[in-house]
Design a protein with these regions (language model features):
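Enriched - but not universal
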Residues: 48, 75, 118, 192, ...
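Alpha-helical scaffolds flanking conserved acidic
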Residues: 186-190
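Short hydrophobic beta-strand that contains or immediately precedes a catalytic carboxylate
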Residues: 99, 191-192
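C-terminal, surface-exposed recognition/capping segments
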Residues: 2-18, 194-269
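Short, compositionally biased
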Residues: 2-185, 252-255, 259-269
Length: 269
């Protein structure tokens, strides 16, 4: 057999294996026609941080549009005025989502929120004990937030907290409003699941650099504890320490920071 033909067949077989592997971990749009340069990007995305981009809403139609820092910085002021910046898109380790541009703050200026529901084991939320298989692979923040808000709406727990302050704050978050920005934020914001929150903590340095560049350092992740929407038991849920990256259970009667997240359900470049 001609050596060039043999090499071409080998390269094709290798690409077929790569495509099959990428498809098996969620990159379902990858196929044999995907350029080799994109295959390399998907392989990076599968194992580490692919990139961080500025997430915006286009004022004209409300569509989400993403820009690299260099793309945004090279735009004219007139072109920038057509978009509202809402957060940072993270693409890493087989996942992508939008991180809100700032932590939640209530009407009184408070920056921490109780989880709520102390004493209630929420039906519809899986209890993840310490070392529980799958704990670090929880990326269901939207589903969790839906359940938490619906279950605890108007319910006063044994510690006197009404509802689900942390989840409610995340869902009510607005990165922009019609009155102040010319467009209403219709993004569905959520209280992150533990796996989502851990990715944010893992790449905190890179995220904070882009946040500082795009929104100012007053909006960076602090070194405090942040709530996740992942349940431990009837009195505790999981949180992440953004100082050292530690993970632990936190009593729901205590108040910690909330950084909303918006899901992106596709995995394509």
């Amino acid at each position: 057999m001609d050596k060039n033909i043999a090499n071409a067949m080998l390269m094709r077989l290798n690409k077929q294996d790569q495509v099959a592997a990428l498809q098996s971990i969620g990159f379902t749009t990858v196929n044999e026609n995907t350029p080799a340069s994109d295959i390399a990007k998907y392989m990076q995305w599968a194992g580490t941080l692919l990139d961080l981009s500025l997430a915006t809403l286009r004022i004209e139609d409300g569509e989400q549009v993403f820009f690299t820092a260099s793309e945004w910085n090279s735009m004219s002021a007139n072109n920038r005025s057509k978009y509202i910046r809402i957060g940072i898109r993270l693409r890493a380790e087989c996942h992508q989502f939008i991180i809100a541009k700032s932590d939640c703050v209530d009407a009184g200026g408070n920056k921490t929120f109780k989880w709520g529901g102390y004493g209630t084991d929420l039906r519809g939320l899986k209890n993840y004990g310490s070392g529980n298989q799958g704990l670090y692979d929880t990326f269901d923040g939207k589903e969790n937030t839906d359940v938490i808000i619906e279950t605890l709406a108007g319910v006063k727990d044994t510690q006197g907290t009404v509802g689900a302050p942390a989840a409610e704050a995340a869902r009510a978050y607005k990165a922009c409003t019609l009155e102040s920005d010319g467009i209403e934020d219709t993004t569905v914001w959520n209280l992150p699941a533990l796996g989502e929150l851990m990715l944010m903590a893992k790449y905190k340095t890179e995220i904070n650099e882009l946040i500082t560049s795009m929104f100012g350092n007053q909006n960076i992740f602090t070194n405090d504890w942040y709530w996740s929407s992942t349940e431990y038991d009837a009195s505790s849920s999981w949180g992440v320490d953004f100082n050292y990256g530690g993970v632990n259970t936190l009593g729901r009667q205590y108040a910690y920071r909330v950084r909303p997240l918006a899901a992106i359900n596709t995995l394509s470049l």
